[in-house]
Amino acid sequence: MAEELRQQVPLMKEMLTAMGVTIVEKEGYEADDLLGTIAKQSEAQGLEVSIVSGDRDLLQLASDHIKIRIPKTKRTGTEIEDYLAKDVVEKYQVTPLQFIDVKALMGDSADNIPGVPGIGEKTATALIVSYGSIENAHDHLEEIKPNRAKQNLSEHYDMAQMSKELATIEIHAPIEYSLEDAKLGNLFTEEAYLMCKRLEFKNMLSRFDIDAPKNLAEEHFTFVTDKKQISDIFKKAKKAGHIGCCLLPGEGIITEQLSLFEQPKEQQVIEGMSIAFSEEDICYLSAGTEVSAEELLEEIRELSGGQTKVSVMDLKETLKTLPLPENDRYFDASVAAYLLNPLKNDYPYEDLAKDYAGLMIPSKTDLLGKESPVKAKQAKPEAFLKYICYMAYIPWKTRDRLLEELNNTGMQTLYDTIELPLVYTLSDMEKEGVHVDAEELKRYGEELAAQIAVLEKEIYEGAGETFNINSPKQLGHILFEKLEMPYGKKTKTGYSTAADVLEKLAVEYPLVSKILEYRQLAKLKSTYADGLANFIEEDGRIHTTFQQTVTATGRLSSTDPNLQNIPIRMELGRMIRKVFLPKDGYIFVDADYSQIELRILAHMSGDEMLIQAYREAQDIHRMTASQVFHTPFEEVTDLQRRNAKAVNFGIVYGISSFGLSQDLSISKKEAQEYIERYFESYPKIKEFLDGCVEKAKKDGYSVTMFGRRRPLPEISSSNFMQRSFGERIAMNAPIQGTAADIIKIAMNRVHRRLIDEGLKSRLLLQVHDELLIEAAPDEVDEVKKILDEEMKGAADLSVELEIDTHTGKNWYEAK
């Protein structure tokens, strides 16, 4: 089966189930066998049977009461050819059962039926018309003409019998099936409707008579404004012991002491909240004239302050309006779902409903379209009620199942000790933000603009004309037609001017070097100089959003703006860090793990040479260069060290010889030799990486030191490129994922220490393996001590984790 089709089989089953169609399957039997069994059983019960299929093998099942209906595509459309037993005889001159013998003699490569060599359809049909069966034809070998057919059947009679067995459809398969199963109701069910919407089957949707299907839970969704009713609901919820809730943020702020920390912090007000604590108790509580937003928050705070478990779709979002103490009573359904399947882009409530509660329910877009919930509350009150209630009902409904799955997959501890505490850490980091000097940012942009203008002029002079440098079509024309440079790859839209093409040219053509530099500076200006300015808020700080449920490896990412991609290679790119300043009177303290992934590789592989090198604080890259290039340690050149560094880090990422050759601008053969020498020097690493691949093939996923799983569907793909990609991920994911776990542990520990020790200093940013703290001047030494203890103590490895710590009056100096 083609990989593309195999991937769709679960969706087909899901759709048929949603439409109320019974699925019959039996391990060890083909679909033809199940069709044959059901057809013959039904015929025996006096039923008229029709089988619709494009497979002519099924003609052997035709009888006076079993009709085989074969669709045939013609210019005028699809026509159906109907075959009862008499129609098979008329068309093929053999009976349905004899059709098996014809198929066995002629063979069929599509069904892996070998047949008899040298006998085609015409000869096979003639033999069976004359003798009735393969066995009878063999009994009359001397009569068979031509002689070649006689000889072939004689020599390959065993193969003919085996082929007949293969071609025969089993009509006594051991399946559980009854006529009741075959009854069809309304195919166009609510569940099927929702699935068609999810899969965007627009033509199918037009066949449904419903606009918005109802789920049974929706019957209990209610809108409550009465003060006494709201009070009664909270009393009842307290007795339930577990609630799902969703706060609806409004406009404005409240400045009460809502936080556990000493300083009062401004919090968003809410328009209301939804709450669910049974299949019948699901409602939206509206703040208004009878009950204020503050009173609702106080009720939910009091409720959660006891022993009541609180489940939400997005705990970090909830903390923006309702600061909650850090403990395991609070449950984040999206984070749990992410751990169980980190390959998805997002984790909306309708997906959790389907995956962990077996419910097909409308999505936010289905209900609200592009309207915000606050606006939809007025414009689409019924749709709003469904949305806001589902946001409470689904986390309540799925909590137990999600926790069960976390436990079954060995990730309960990962959730409890790393991911859940991280929600609180990230929430505080987002609230703190980081100060950006708007004037310095403006000056940085002006400096970039000036350099870009100089480059533009030089590029135009080199090209002999002005043109749009940002247009691939115009640039391709200049480089490959006017200037006749090599490596031109023509596509449908013109020549490729991708970075890999230009980098080859840049070695010999200064003009191309300037174009690459122009692109880098233009990117810096648009993304950082211009882009960051749009995110500076009234407090003068940027409050990025850390994304905890996005990357498959467990790494954090950030948006609005993305601070994970702050440049580090170009000096002019690094200069952007100068615009990030601590608040007045404070100092930045920056700590960065040193070679964390290589240290993890040393630990997980158990390679004694690498472990010993780290314990002796050797220069790892110089040592690798010495091994790979067979050069005494003290004679290793800077170039050899740089190449060895690329090999070291490339191995961690499962790099291929092609990838390494591209990185080092060497031949693929040379790169392969580097890799082979590396593994000769560090045999335990080769053994470890091969073991990672084999284990992933067996399990279908990779796993980190802390139990994080990364599913690897690619590793079993029939496509070589996909499978190779899966194997590289299998090597890298345990290492990169473990590094992600360690930095998260460090973040949680540093964050908690700063708070528990009553310090004014705060953790602001995490970028890859780096933490940035805004430290009070009298706390700098203590902050350094905390970073050293907590980052090094985040994992117990056979090689000590090391950090580089720096201070400065801006992020550039601290780095």
Where do the model's predicted regions map?
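Short beta-strand
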Residues: I51, N468-N470, R762-V767
